[in-house]
Structure formats: structure tokens, C-alpha cells
Amino acid sequence: IDSEKVFGFKSNMKILGFKEKTKFVPEIDDSYLFDEITTKAILAGFCYNRRVMIQGYHGTGKSTHIEQVAARLNWPCVRVNLDSHISRLDLVGKDAIVLKDGKQITEFREGVLPWALQNPVAIVFDEYDAGRADVMFVIQRVLEVSGKLTLLDNNRVINPHQNFRLFA
């Protein structure tokens, strides 16, 4: 991808994206103006598989900036708001009662984090500073070098997909 044409500045990074747009790729806002320094940090996350945290005042467009970079790369992107309503179970998964062959059974249903880890998806943790301690502990494991997530509920270790990315 030509960074000058797409983002308005030159870069030495080899910027790759996906050919096809999928349902999780954000819509492009043609009027969006990219801040060069912030965009380069976000691109480094995509290009070099680095975890990137953007800081700034509430409502200044940090998550939108990440989404607009993802949109131009055709990179699937999911935003998760870490407000006080999201729990560890929402993030990791939980047992649910489901109907199977006409019978009610209990089955583990993965949350958004295991799903994202196993797919070519950029997950954006919005309002990172508002996350509950139990939620932040789960995220901390994914921030580590290997990025593996252990699901104790079903005795499984998830290795991240090569195109999984994490932003906050």
C-alpha cells in the first residue's frame, strides 16, 4: 500500500493489507484526516505485530483513528468498550444452556477475545483506563510476548492468529 497516496505521508514501512473487504472491516470515511505520528504508530502495530496504545483525552477520536487505518488496509476490526459493564466472562466466554438434538445441555461459548485471537482481526479496547481489574488481568496475558490465552473453563490454550492485532 502506498502510504503517501492512502495516508498523505511517506513511510519506509512495508504496508500490507487484505485484498477483500469482509463484514468486520470498518467503513472508510473519505473526509478523515490522518495525524502522521499517530498513524505511523498504528501502522507499526499492523505491520510488525506490535501492541499499540494510543493515549489522549476522552472523545478525541483515538479508536476512530485506528478504525480508519484498518479500513484502508481492509483489516477486520472490532471495538470493545471496556466500560464497567463488560466482565471477564463477556471477554473470555461462559457456559450457556443450548438446545442440541432437542435436549438442553450446557456448552461453553467463547467470548470476543478468544474469537478475535483465532482470526485475522484487530481488536480495539476502547476506554482502556475504565476496565475492571478482572478484565484487565485477562488482557494482560494477551499483551505478553507469546500472546497466548489459556481458557481454563475448557482446558485450552489459544495461540494468536498470525494476523491478530491488538490496540487500546
Positions of the model-derived regions?
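AAA+ P-loop NTPase catalytic core and its hallmark functional loops
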Residues: 1-168
